[in-house]
């Protein structure tokens, strides 16, 4: 089973493009084959990182992946060799990765041999923290499980759920401040970031991180709201509508942007991740887009043929059992299976026919069965012997 692309890059579902790009650069440097010659494990990690970045750096692919998982992007993501480079990653990512190889990772170093490329493509450090200062702290993602019947999965369904999550505080309107007043953070002086400078034999390195005092916001609260203790969020309950497409499977999930926990002090809300769980069906067995129904038929009906009523996911339908039907025969009812996730009709229902053998019979039925047993036409060995004889053996039997 493929690893989640967000886990591969070590980012969350609410991460923006800059966070994803930064994580990709760091991992690309860490697992690059030039830094790990002959290391097959590092090579595999490098391919996984490239594949994940190709999807998550593309808005359309990321949207489909968030909604349907790996099934949503299909073969569009690289399967090992090409990765982000083959998928069209911009040159700034490539040059930045090489820059990191020369400078020791994610930190910036003065006098980088690739500084010109970095400036040309907007790869300068520090922007991420400043952007966080203007947008606040993101809320966390929320994951729930949604149980579905096979009937609901077959055609898709709309579900309305009540979800407990962090919501903006009504008293302070999510600001976390009792009066609404804020002041410039004394630690970062409003930049939302702090810098740590270290000197090595290779030069001076500057590591930039979000300010721990204000969380990257650049401002702090003067007087905290007593209802939410300055967080700007409280536990609440909201109602969400979920449009479940036909054809989902166990473990498939849908990401609902901005429906997760609200961010502290006005920060953007995280995502709601709905994981689908198929309820075991007592009548049908699922096989991909098809369903299987086991039907027991009496011996006379198997021999003579009959019409029976069988259940489907859409209601009962009439089914013809042809004369001479053999046990384990699969009869198809077209279009009564599971809808395809990406559209294009539904699968089929297969009816597996078997002989019904009663455990107890009446005296009269026993006598009838004894008479039937005497018939050579009902003896499987007689049929087998007859079919296995050669032409000359059959001719000899006729004239002897």
UniProtKB/Swiss-Prot annotation:
Keywords, in A-Z order: Chaperone, Cytoplasm, DNA replication, Metal-binding, Repeat, Stress response, Zinc, Zinc-finger
Cofactor(s) named in the record: Zn(2+)
Residue numbers binding Zn(2+) 1: 169, 172, 225, 228
Signal peptide stretch: none
GO molecular function, one term: zinc ion binding
Cofactor binding: number and manner: Binds 2 Zn(2+) ions per monomer.
Keyword Mitochondrion: no
Zinc finger residue ranges, CR-type: 156-237
A GO-annotated cellular component: cytoplasm
GO-annotated biological processes: chaperone cofactor-dependent protein refolding; DNA replication; protein refolding; response to heat
InterPro entries: DnaJ, DnaJ_C, DnaJ_domain, DnaJ_domain_CS, HSP40/DnaJ_pept-bd, HSP_DnaJ_Cys-rich_dom, HSP_DnaJ_Cys-rich_dom_sf, J_dom_sf
Domain J: residue ranges: 4-69
Record PANTHER family: CHAPERONE PROTEIN DNAJ, DNAJ HOMOLOG 1, MITOCHONDRIAL-RELATED
Assembly: Homodimer.
Domain notes: The J domain is necessary and sufficient to stimulate DnaK ATPase activity. Zinc center 1 plays an important role in the autonomous, DnaK-independent chaperone activity of DnaJ. Zinc center 2 is essential for interaction with DnaK and for DnaJ activity.
Annotated HAMAP family: DnaJ
Protein name (record): Chaperone protein DnaJ
Organism the protein comes from: Chlorobium chlorochromatii (strain CaD3)
Gene name per UniProt: dnaJ
């Amino acid at each position: 089973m493929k690893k989640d692309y967000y886990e591969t890059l070590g980012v969350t579902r609410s991460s923006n493009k800059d966070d994803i790009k930064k994580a990709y650069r760091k991992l690309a440097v860490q697992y690059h084959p030039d830094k790990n010659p002959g290391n097959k494990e590092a090579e595999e990690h490098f391919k996984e990182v490239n594949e994940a970045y190709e999807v998550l750096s593309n808005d359309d692919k990321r949207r489909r992946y968030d909604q349907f998982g790996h099934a949503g992007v299909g073969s569009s993501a690289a399967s090992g060799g090409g990765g982000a480079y083959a998928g069209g990653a911009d040159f700034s990512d490539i040059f930045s990765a090489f820059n990191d190889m020369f400078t020791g990772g994610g930190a910036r170093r003065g006098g980088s041999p690739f500084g010109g490329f970095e400036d040309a493509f907007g790869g300068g450090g520090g922007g991420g923290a400043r952007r966080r200062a203007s947008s606040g702290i993101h809320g966390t993602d929320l994951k729930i499980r949604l149980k579905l019947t096979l009937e609901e999965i077959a055609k898709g369904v709309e579900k309305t759920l009540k979800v407990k999550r962090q919501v903006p505080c009504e008293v302070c309107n999510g600001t976390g401040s009792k009066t609404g007043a804020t002041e410039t953070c004394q630690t970062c002086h409003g930049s939302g970031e702090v810098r740590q400078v270290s000197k090595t034999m290779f030069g001076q390195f500057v590591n930039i991180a979000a300010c721990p005092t204000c969380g990257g916001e650049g401002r702090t609260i003067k007087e905290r709201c007593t209802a939410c203790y300055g967080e700007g969020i409280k536990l609440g309950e909201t109602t969400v509508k979920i449009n479940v497409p036909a054809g989902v499977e166990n473990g498939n999930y849908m990401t609902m942007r901005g429906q997760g926990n609200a961010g502290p002090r006005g920060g953007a809300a995280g995502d709601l991740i709905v994981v689908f769980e198929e309820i075991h069906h007592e009548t049908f067995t699922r096989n991909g887009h098809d369903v299987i129904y086991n039907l027991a038929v009496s011996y006379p009906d198997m021999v003579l043929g009959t019409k029976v009523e069988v259940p489907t996911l859409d209601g009962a339908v009439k089914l013809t059992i042809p004369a001479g039907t053999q046990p384990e025969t699969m009869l198809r009812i077209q279009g009564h299976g599971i809808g395809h996730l990406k559209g294009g009709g539904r699968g089929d229902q297969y009816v597996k026919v078997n002989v019904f053998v009663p455990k107890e019979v009446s005296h009269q039925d026993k006598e009838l069965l004894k008479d039937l047993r005497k018939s050579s036409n009902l003896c499987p060995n007689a049929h087998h012997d007859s079919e296995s004889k050669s032409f000359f053996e059959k001719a000899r039997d006729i004239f002897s």
